[in-house]
């Protein structure tokens, strides 16, 4: 498609007298990583919740692939092609890596989750297709040797990778990542950053990333948008953001 994959205009959200978002305007282009940064309480997660449908703004529009989705429910947005990970893990710890990734395909299953288990022909065919796609995601994330391991037995970094695999199973046209590096060690962060870049480069999936690790943000972002008190105060390439006096005063000076 031509033009932005995602376009946000005049987006405002308030909880009583607290203005979480104030006239936010943002566009995400195809195969682009846009990072949202700012102090705690700046509105980053609120914006992600508006994009994924968990919050409904009082004003403004969210347009995804040319379609106004501002009033669309979260599950409808997922079906439309918006995948998301959360700050907390959304994995099923008693299930295997393979089963977790397969569970991510539920929005795409025309025959329903249990059709394959009931041995309906359409369900069996669909199950085979998604099993093949799940294997491809497992290999992409370098989890082949762990495909049959219970997720609860894995390290935190590997569980984060499985969580990302579940989001990829939605077959998204846009991926929203909420603080994916939180709680990870240096090696785990490096691995996950590499996979995020591969998602952009090999799969051509644009990504909106909320992240506090400035080294990761500056290394992998195409653009950085800076928020403060619900407002977008700066936007540009990482090198521009590093040298922006207002950003340094509001956020980077704290690092």
Task: Cite the ranges covered by each PLM segment.
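Glycine-rich phosphate-binding loops of nucleotide-dependent enzymes
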Residues: 2-255
């Amino acid at each position: 498609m031509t033009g932005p994959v995602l376009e946000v205009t005049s987006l405002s959200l308030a909880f009583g007298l607290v203005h979480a978002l104030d006239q936010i305007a943002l566009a995400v282009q195809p195969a682009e990583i846009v990072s949202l940064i700012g102090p705690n309480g700046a509105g980053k997660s609120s914006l992600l919740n508006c994009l994924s449908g968990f919050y409904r703004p009082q004003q403004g529009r969210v347009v995804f692939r040319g379609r106004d989705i501002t009033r669309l429910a979260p599950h409808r947005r997922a079906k439309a092609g918006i995948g998301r990970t959360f700050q907390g893990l959304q994995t099923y710890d008693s299930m295997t890596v393979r089963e977790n990734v397969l569970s991510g395909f539920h929005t795409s299953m025309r025959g329903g989750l249990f059709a394959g288990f009931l041995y309906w022909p359409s369900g069996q065919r669909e199950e085979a297709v998604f099993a093949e796609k799940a294997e491809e995601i497992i290999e992409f994330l370098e989890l082949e040797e762990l495909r049959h391991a219970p997720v609860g037995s894995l390290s935190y970094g590997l569980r984060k990778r499985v969580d990302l695999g579940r989001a990829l199973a939605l077959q998204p046209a846009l991926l929203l990542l909420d603080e994916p590096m939180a709680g990870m060690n240096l090696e785990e962060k490096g691995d996950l950053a590499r996979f995020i870049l591969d998602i952009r480069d090999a799969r051509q999936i644009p990504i909106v990333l909320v992240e506090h690790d400035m080294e990761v943000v500056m290394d992998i972002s195409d653009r950085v948008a800076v928020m403060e008190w619900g407002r977008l105060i700066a936007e540009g390439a990482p090198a521009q953001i590093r040298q922006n006096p207002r950003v340094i005063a509001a956020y980077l000076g704290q690092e």
